[in-house]
C-alpha cells in the first residue's frame, strides 16, 4: 500500500529515488518494530534499566530518510553517521599474517603466487556477484597487497605502476564496509567515501569501477565541463561514494551542495599527477575539511616532496606498499617497446604501416604533443582508417561520445594529446604510438600505460628523429626497459602531401637536434633547414630557415622546401619562428623573428631577435 501511495503522489520523482524511499520505509516498518515494541513494553512495566533510544531515533528505529516539502528536490537521506559508529573500524576483519604487517611492504611486478579468489574474501555477496558478472573472480597478488591492509582499516601510501588494477583493490574494502554499515545503521545523505582524481577520464573510470562493483550504492562523478546544477540535485538525493576532480569538488563545497563531514574513507589516486596539473593547493584545502577520524589511502607512481609532505600531515601512521619494488622498470611486464627513426616530413606517413604490422587489428592510440597535430593527423589518417581526435578543445559531451565510440569499436585509431594519457578508460588497447618524443619520462610512462593493462599484452612504438638516439637511450634508462629498434620505413615524399605540416618539428624533449636546447627535458630543436613547429614550438630552428609556421594557423613549420617557409623569413605563423608559445628552443637565424615567445628557455644567436 505504501508503495502505491508513493507512486501516485510522487510521480515526478526519479525511479532511483522512489525505490530508495520505499526500501527505507519498509526497512523501518518490518525490521525495527520488534525492538521498538519491546522498549515500549518494558517502559510500561516500570523497567528502569532500558537503554534510551538514540537522539535521532523514532519508535520505528533510526531514521533512514527525511522528507522535506520545499521547492528543491526531496532529501531522501538523513545524516545518521555521527550516532552510528565508524565503519572503517567496525567492519575491519583481522587478517593474520606471519610476522604481521609492518610499516612497509614490497611487492614485485609479478607478485608471485596464485590469484586470490574473491569469493574467499568474506565480502558482501552483492559484490561477489557483481564482480563475477564482469568476469572477475580472482585478484592479482599485487591487488591483494593493497586489499588486505585496506580491509584492516590502515592508512596507506602505495607506489604503483600504471595499469596494475589498484582501483579494484582499494575499492572492494570500501564498498564492502559501506554496504555493511548501511545495512546496520541505514543510509545517510552525505558521502561516506571521497576519491580525488587529477583528470576527468580517471575520475569517470574510478566511479564506474565503484558503480559496477556495487550496484546498490549511489555513486557520483564530479568534474567540470558538465552542468553543476544536475550534480547538485544528485547530491541532494543522497550519495554513498563521490569521485571527482579537486576543482569541481571545491566548487560544490563552496555552494553548500557537498558536505564532507561524514566522509570515512578518502583516496587520492595518481597523487603525483595532482601536483603536475596544479591541484596541489585544492587537494590540501579538501583534506583539511575532512573528519579527523577516517581511513586515508594515497597512490602515486612517484614520490615527490609534496607527496611526502601530504603523508606526514594527513595520514595516520601509514603503511607504505611498494608495488614496484627495487626494479627500475616502470612499465607493466606485458608491454613490448619499439622505436623507429623517421624524418619530420615522413613521420605521419608511417603511422599506417605501423598500425598494420603491430596493431593486430585492435585498438590503437597515437599520442601527439599538440591539439593542432592531433586534428591534422586524424584528418589525414581518416582517408584510409576509421579515426578520431581527442584533445582539450573538444567539448566534454563530444569527448565522451568519442571515447564511447572507441570503446565500442566504431573506430580503431584514436589520436590524442596528453589530456587522455591519464585514466583513459579504454580496455584492450593493443598499440600505443608516440608520434614524437614526449616532454618527460613520466609522460612516456603514462602514455604507454594505456596498453598492457591488468596483465594483458601490448606494444608501444616511439617515433624519433635520426639525431635523437641519445634521447631514446635516456628514456630507456629512466623507464628501465629497452627499445627494440625497427627498420626504417621508406616513404615517398609525395605520399606525405596529405599530412603536410603535421609534426614538422623533429625536436621534442630530451634535447637532440643540432641547434636545439640540448639536455634532458629541454624541448630540443630540429636540425638542418626544418622549422620551429606548430602551437607550442617545442624547438627552434637552425640553418637558414626562419622556423616555418608558428602556432595558430601556421603552415606547420616543416622545412622551407615543403611547407612554404622561405629562407630567411619568419614563416607563416603568428608568433614567429623560434618555437612559439613557450617554445624552449633556439634560433640561429639572423633574420628570424626571434627566440621563443612567451618566455622560451632557449638561446638565440641571431642578431635581430625580439
Swiss-Prot record:
EC number(s) recorded for this UniProt protein: 3.6.4.13
Region (Disordered): 542-610
A Gene Ontology term for the protein's cellular component: viral replication complex
EC class: hydrolase
Family label: Belongs to the DEAD box helicase family. DDX21/DDX50 subfamily.
Species name: Arabidopsis thaliana (Mouse-ear cress)
Transit peptide boundaries: 1-66
Domain spans labelled Helicase C-terminal: 350-494
Listed Low complexity bias regions: 558-572, 586-596
Domain remark in the UniProt entry: The Q motif is unique to and characteristic of the DEAD box family of RNA helicases and controls ATP binding and hydrolysis.
Motif Q motif per UniProt: ranges: 116-144
Intervals of motif DEAD box: 269-272
Protein name: DEAD-box ATP-dependent RNA helicase 9, mitochondrial
Binding positions for ATP per the UniProt entry: 160-167
Keywords assigned: ATP-binding, Helicase, Hydrolase, Mitochondrion, Nucleotide-binding, RNA-binding, Transit peptide
Catalytic activity of the protein: ATP + H2O = ADP + phosphate + H(+)
Domain Helicase ATP-binding, chain residue ranges per copy: 147-321
Segments of skewed composition (Gly residues): 542-557, 573-585
Gene Ontology BP terms: response to cold; response to salt stress; response to water deprivation; viral RNA genome replication
Amino acid at each position: 500500500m505504501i508503495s502505491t501511495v508513493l507512486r501516485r503522489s510522487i510521480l515526478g520523482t526519479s525511479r532511483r529515488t522512489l525505490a530508495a524511499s520505499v526500501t527505507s520505509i519498509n526497512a523501518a516498518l518490518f525490521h525495527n518494530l520488534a525492538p521498538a515494541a519491546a522498549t515500549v513494553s518494558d517502559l510500561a512495566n516500570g523497567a528502569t534499566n532500558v537503554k534510551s533510544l538514540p537522539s535521532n531515533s523514532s519508535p520505528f528505529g533510526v531514521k533512514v530518510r527525511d522528507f522535506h516539502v520545499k521547492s528543491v528536490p526531496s532529501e531522501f537521506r538523513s545524516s545518521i553517521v555521527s550516532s552510528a559508529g565508524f565503519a572503517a573500524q567496525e567492519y575491519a576483519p583481522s587478517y593474520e599474517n606471519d610476522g604481521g604487517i609492518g610499516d612497509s611492504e614490497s611487492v614485485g611486478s609479478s607478485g608471485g603466487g596464485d590469484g586470490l579468489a574473491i569469493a574467499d574474501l568474506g565480502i558482501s555477496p552483492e559484490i561477489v556477484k557483481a564482480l563475477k558478472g564482469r568476469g572477475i573472480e580472482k585478484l592479482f597478488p599485487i591487488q591483494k597487497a593493497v586489499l588486505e591492509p585496506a580491509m584492516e582499516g590502515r592508512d596507506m601510501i602505495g607506489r604503483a605502476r600504471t595499469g596494475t588494477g589498484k582501483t579494484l583493490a582499494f575499492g572492494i574494502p570500501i564498498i564492502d564496509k559501506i554496504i555493511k554499515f548501511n545495512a546496520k545503521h541505514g543510509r545517510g545523505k552525505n558521502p561516506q567515501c571521497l576519491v580525488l582524481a587529477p583528470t576527468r577520464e580517471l575520475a569517470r573510470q574510478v566511479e564506474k569501477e565503484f558503480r559496477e562493483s556495487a550496484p546498490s550504492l549511489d555513486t557520483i562523478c564530479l568534474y567540470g565541463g558538465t552542468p553543476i546544477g544536475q550534480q547538485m540535485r544528485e547530491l541532494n538525493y543522497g550519495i554513498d561514494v563521490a569521485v571527482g576532480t579537486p576543482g569541481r569538488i571545491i566548487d560544490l563545497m563552496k555552494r553548500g551542495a557537498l558536505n564532507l563531514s561524514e566522509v570515512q574513507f578518502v583516496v587520492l589516486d595518481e597523487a603525483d599527477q595532482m601536483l603536475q596539473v596544479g591541484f596541489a593547493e585544492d587537494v590540501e584545502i579538501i583534506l583539511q575539511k575532512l573528519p579527523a577520524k577516517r581511513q586515508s589511502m594515497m597512490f602515486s607512481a612517484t614520490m615527490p616532496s609534496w607527496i611526502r609532505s601530504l603523508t606526514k600531515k594527513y595520514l595516520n601512521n601509514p603503511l607504505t606498499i611498494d608495488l614496484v619494488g627495487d626494479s627500475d622498470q616502470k612499465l607493466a611486464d606485458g608491454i613490448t617497446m619499439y622505436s623507429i627513426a623517421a624524418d619530420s616530413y615522413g613521420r605521419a606517413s608511417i603511422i599506417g604501416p605501423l598500425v598494420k604490422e603491430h596493431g593486430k587489428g585492435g585498438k590503437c592510440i597515437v599520442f601527439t604533443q599538440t591539439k593542432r597535430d592531433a586534428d591534422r593527423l586524424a584528418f589525414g589518417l581518416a582517408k584510409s582508417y576509421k579515426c578520431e581526435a581527442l584533445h582539450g578543445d573538444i567539448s566534454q559531451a563530444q569527448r565522451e561520445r568519442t571515447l564511447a565510440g572507441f570503446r565500442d569499436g566504431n573506430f580503431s585509431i584514436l589520436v590524442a594529446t596528453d589530456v587522455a594519457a591519464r585514466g583513459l578508460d579504454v580496455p584492450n588497447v593493443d598499440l600505443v604510438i608516440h608520434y614524437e618524443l614526449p616532454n618527460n619520462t613520466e609522460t612516456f610512462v603514462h602514455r604507454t600505460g594505456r596498453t598492457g593493462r591488468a596483465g594483458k599484452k601490448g606494444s608501444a612504438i616511439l617515433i624519433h628523429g635520426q639525431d635523437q638516439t641519445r634521447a631514446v637511450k635516456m628514456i630507456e634508462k629512466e623507464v628501465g626497459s629497452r627499445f627494440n629498434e625497427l627498420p626504417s620505413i621508406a616513404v615517398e615524399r609525395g605520399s606525405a602531401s596529405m599530412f603536410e605540416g603535421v609534426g614538422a618539428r623533429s625536436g621534442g624533449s630530451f634535447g637532440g637536434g643540432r641547434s636545439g636546447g640540448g639536455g634532458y627535458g629541454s624541448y630540443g630543436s630540429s636540425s638542418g633547414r626544418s622549422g620551429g613547429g606548430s602551437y607550442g614550438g617545442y624547438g627552434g630552428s637552425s640553418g637558414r630557415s626562419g622556423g616555418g609556421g608558428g602556432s595558430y594557423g601556421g603552415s606547420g613549420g616543416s622545412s622551407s622546401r615543403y611547407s612554404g617557409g622561405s629562407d630567411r623569413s619568419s614563416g607563416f605563423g603568428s608568433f614567429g619562428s623560434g618555437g612559439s608559445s613557450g617554445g624552449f628552443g633556439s634560433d640561429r637565424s639572423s633574420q628570424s623573428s626571434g627566440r621563443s615567445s612567451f618566455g622560451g628557455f632557449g638561446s638565440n644567436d641571431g642578431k635581430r631577435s625580439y
